[in-house]
């Protein structure tokens, strides 16, 4: 898709993660800083987002239910960045989330594509600490990708400004 250093660039960003991770809530918080009632996404949501530096983003929020994950690969061709959302409170499903991320990153369309992992729901008292999530994900093994890991809360908005900055940084890398 090209470098984001050029003026007027349009970047395609795909957001994936297991069901109930908070992808749709994050999408609409980033879009208008508003909290919306959500239902499980069947298919996808897509929203434009203007970013500093004359960058227009198109954010694709793809449903994360088990039966929809087989379609994830259909959204990877030509993307500029992957955002992968984890539910920090769902320790039982963390291995499943890691396995799905690995599968996505192994797709040939993902060669060299940077990714941002958002550890969502950090406001919850039972949320796993970011360092523990980092250790379990072992992201350093993905040497063919630029990546960042950020803690956030879609509910409170905590960490979403930093997530947006990371997103733009990765697009420029």
Swiss-Prot record:
Q: What does this protein do?
A: May play a role in apoptosis. May act as a tumor suppressor.
Q: Is Cell membrane tagged as a keyword?
A: no
Gene, per the UniProt record: Arl11
GO MF terms, alphabetically ordered = GTP binding; GTPase activity
**GO CC terms in record:** cytoplasm; plasma membrane
Question: Could you say which residues bind GTP here?
Answer: 17-24, 61-65, 120-123
Lipidated positions per record (N-myristoyl glycine): 2
One Pfam entry for this protein is Arf
Q: Which UniProt keywords apply?
A: GTP-binding, Lipoprotein, Myristate, Nucleotide-binding
**InterPro entries linked:** P-loop_NTPase, Small_GTP-bd, Small_GTPase_ARF, Small_GTPase_ARF/SAR
**GO biological process terms on file:** hematopoietic progenitor cell differentiation; intracellular protein transport; vesicle-mediated transport
Q: Which family does it belong to?
A: Belongs to the small GTPase superfamily. Arf family.
Q: So which domain of life are we looking at? A: Eukaryota
Name this protein carries in UniProt: ADP-ribosylation factor-like protein 11
């Amino acid at each position: 898709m090209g470098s984001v250093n050029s003026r007027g660039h349009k970047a395609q960003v795909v957001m994936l993660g297991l069901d109930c991770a908070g992808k749709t809530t994050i999408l609409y918080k980033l879009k208008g800083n508003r909290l919306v009632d959500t239902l499980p996404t069947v298919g996808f949501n897509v929203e434009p987002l203007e970013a500093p530096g004359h960058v227009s983003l198109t954010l694709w929020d793809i449903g994360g239910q088990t039966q929809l994950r087989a379609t994830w690969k259909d959204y990877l061709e030509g993307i500029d960045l992957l955002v992968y959302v984890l539910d920090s409170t769902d320790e039982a499903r963390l291995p499943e989330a890691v396995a799905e991320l690995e599968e996505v990153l192994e797709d040939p369309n993902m060669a060299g594509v940077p990714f941002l992992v958002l550890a969502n729901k950090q406001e919850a008292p039972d949320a796993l600490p970011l360092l523990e999530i980092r250790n379990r994900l072992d992201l350093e093994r993905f040497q063919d990708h630029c990546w960042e890991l950020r803690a956030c809360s879609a509910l409170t908005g905590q960490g979403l400004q930093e997530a947006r900055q990371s997103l733009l940084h990765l697009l420029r890398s």
